[in-house]
Amino acid sequence: PNCKDPDGWVDAMNEVFPKYEINTPERIASFIAQCGHESGGWRVFSENLNYSAKALDAIFGKYFKRAARDSEPYHRQPEKIANVVYANRMSNGDTDSGDGWKYRGRGPIQLTGKANYSAFASDMDVDVVDNPDKVSEDKEVALMSAIWYWNKNGLNRYADSGDIKTMTKRINGGYIGLEDRIHHWKEALHMLGSDVSEHESDDEFVEEPSPEDIGVLRKGMKSVGVVMMQEALGITADGDFGP
């Protein structure tokens, strides 16, 4: 319901899905539901790095410390933030190279880092190393980037068995938004003419996990996952897992 151009996305899916074995109601519904959640309802295809200085300290503090930089000058400066937090990782160059911003997260399942852009370009024969904006602006390329990740992680087998919980863990690293993913998966299955009840024999996988189960989080960690866990628990969300 939030998608800005549903007809355009349907056309792109009809073109791309058959080429990469997203070719059954179960696989199509799973892909649409998972990517829909990850992209805010098929609306957001470029990583939002518009963080306050406080949020930067909570979420990316270790990268600023590693770069010997104070977060305050980076307050609400997305390009500068990307160039610090993604520097010297994932085959990106240093802060001054601009690779962090150039290869920031894009697509329905955020393709991030020069190494991943290069691997995707090589495997799928599409030029995104020199033209990374294709991943967020060209619908077919955007879908291909998500399918590349999907197939690398063997997600069709979970789609075939209706194991949305494990699929979510492989994509998200935890179970954030599981209920929403399941809701849209059921909707998509219904629209594709598949009997949802056939996929509900094992109730365990549709159970919303407790906040303690969100991701692999340990004391001392500072991350987005910690922020989300704290919000789920109703406590101050400072991104710092500790007393």
Locate the predicted segments by residue:
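Second-shell loop/turn segments in exported
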Residues: 1-4, 17-21, 30, 71, ...
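Solvent-exposed, polar/charged alpha-helical surfaces in well-ordered, non-transmembrane soluble domains
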Residues: 11, 15, 29-32, 144, ...
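Acidic helix/loop microenvironments that form the catalytic cleft of cell-wall polysaccharide enzymes
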Residues: 35-38, 159-177, 243
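Short acidic, glycine/serine/threonine-rich helix-capping segments at coil-helix boundaries
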Residues: 211-243
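Low-complexity, Gly/Ser/Thr/Pro-rich intrinsically disordered linker/tail segments
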Residues: 170-214, 231-232
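Active-site-adjacent structural elements in enzyme catalytic domains
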Residues: 25-40
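Extracellular/periplasmic catalytic domains that process cell-envelope and extracellular macromolecules
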Residues: 23-27, 101-104, 141, 162-164
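Peptidoglycan-targeting cell-wall enzymes and recognition modules
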Residues: 1-8, 12, 36-148
